[in-house]
Amino acid sequence: MINLDGKTALLTASGQGIGKATAEAFVEAGAYVIATDINQESLSLLKDVVNETHILDVTNYNEIKKLIRSIQAPDILFNCAGIVHNGTILESTDDDWDLAFNLNSKSMYHMIKEILPVMINKGGGSIINIASVSSSTKGIPNRFIYTASKAAVLGITKSVAADYINHGIRCNAICPGTIQSPSLEQRLSDMGDYESARKQFVARQPMARFGKAKEVANL
C-alpha cells in the first residue's frame, strides 16, 4: 500500500467485504478515512478504526449532496456500493432493473458528480469504482441485470478518466471475481442448497477458491 499521509478518503459500502477491507487498508496507509454505509450496525464496527462514519443511502441524491457539503474535501473516492441480481433477461423485471442500476451505476454517477468539483478545486484526486469481472472480461450465466449495470460502471469510469485527466484526476475501475463476504454467504444461503451452491461458485473460479476482500483492498 502506498503512503497516504495527508490524504482524505471517502468510501461507500464500508460496513463489510471489500469496502471494509479497503477502509482498513487506507487507515494503515495513513489516510484520514471517512466510511459510509446504509447499515448502521455494520458501520459501527469501524467506528474505532476510521476517523469518521456516516450513514448514507447512495440511492438518495440529497443525502449524497448533504454528506459532501459536511465533510472535509476528499482526495480519494472509493465507490463500492452494489447489489447482485440473479436471473436471465426473461426472468428480470423493470423493478429489478431499476434497483440494480440505481444502486450499482446511478449512485456512482451522483457520487462522482458531487465530488469532482471538490477535486478540481484541490488540483487533483483519485476515483476508484468497483465494477466486476462480469461485464469486463466475460459474461456470467444468470447475471443479466448485474452484468449490464456493471458494464455501465466501466463506461462511467472511462468517460470520467478521459474528461478530467487534465485536472489531475484519475478514475479507475477494479473488476473482482467472486469475493468471500457476508453478502456472498447470504446469496449462497438464499439459493436453498448452500453446499451445492458453494461448490458451483468455487468451481468456476480460476484459482479454485473465492477471492479475499483484503486482496482487492491491496490493489
Segment roles from a protein language model:
Residues 88-89, 96-101, 201:
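Substrate-binding pocket helix/loop in short-chain dehydrogenase/reductase
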Residues 117, 162-163:
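Alpha-helical segment proximal to the catalytic Tyr-Lys
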Residues 132:
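Residue(s) in the substrate-gating loop at a strand-loop-helix junction
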Residues 176-186:
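Short, flexible catalytic-loop segment of classical short-chain dehydrogenase/reductase
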Residues 173, 195-219:
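C-terminal helical subdomain
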Residues 112, 149, 157:
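Active-site helix of classical SDR
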Residues 92, 138-147, 159, 187:
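Active-site loop-to-helix junction immediately N-terminal to the catalytic Tyr of the SDR YXXXK motif
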